[in-house]
Amino acid sequence: MTDGHTTKSGYMSESGRVTGSCHCGRVTLSVPHAPLWAASCNCSLCARTGWLVVYYPDAQVEVTGETVAYIWDDRMIGIHHCPVCGCGTHWQTLREDFGKMGVYARLLDRFDVGAVEVRLMDNRE
């Protein structure tokens, strides 16, 4: 922490949580701590969007604001985005409890990709 409120890779609220939002600010996210690593996935969707995903237990992620879910053929996860600005915000499982959800790291305030390990995930269909 540098000034009691920031870390190298995110804004830390008074509660110690890291916050972020979509581009227009209508969807906000709060996670328990700054990410230590992020996943760079090569699935058909992530390869097109360039998302970096950080994972947290479902119960530790707070999402406020209305989102729209995109669900494709395998129907395993819902990819959520803001209906106003279109920013992808997070994904949640639909069929089974993975015990985690994915949050798009670049939405976290002051996220610095150079401050975290980026792990390549091979999920190409």
Which stretches of residues belong to each language-model region?
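A short Gly-Trp-Pro
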Residues: T2-S21, R26-E125
